[in-house]
Amino acid sequence: MEDPQVAAVERAMVAIRRSQTRRALQRLAGDVELDPALFGVIDAVEEETEAATVTSVAGRMGVDQPRASRLVARAVEAGLVRRVADPADGRRSTLELTELGVGHAERVHRFRREIFDAAMRDWSERERKEFARLLTAFVAELGRRHREG
């Protein structure tokens, strides 16, 4: 028998994914002058705790290596990311955000948080805290299961 709560979560997750399409983000972003396809690259480089590479960007974005490579190249061309020679292995390069990339990351964070804040505007502080706690735990568990295969 199907669990109605799990089905509701599935529908909500699909709706979130649809709302995060490139076209939807561009329409919402308005004055944020950044190709939404590069949002993921900025996020992936910024979130990496080790040295970011094209491989780590691909993993964080959930895309294959060739797609990540093309997106990283576009981010480099746009001046958002720079390639840096890895001192431990000269054949390898790592990625870091440029000053422009950091500025765009801050603007994107602000933009997203404004959208989320507006969506929760009528919620109590307790509801916001509980939602943040549950969503964070849910995402962590999904990530753990994804890594374990």
Residue ranges and their predicted role:
Residues 1-36:
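N-terminal leader segment of winged-helix/HTH proteins
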Residues 1-4, 129, 133-149:
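C-terminal regulatory/oligomerization modules of transcriptional regulators
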Residues 18, 43-49, 109, 136:
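Short, locally clustered residues in the helix-turn-helix/winged-helix DNA-binding domain
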Residues 22-64, 78:
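N-terminal helix-turn-helix DNA-binding core of bacterial DNA-binding proteins
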Residues 40-43, 117, 132-133:
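A cross-family signal for key residues in well-ordered alpha-helices
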Residues 73-129:
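Charged, amphipathic alpha-helical coiled-coil/dimerization segments
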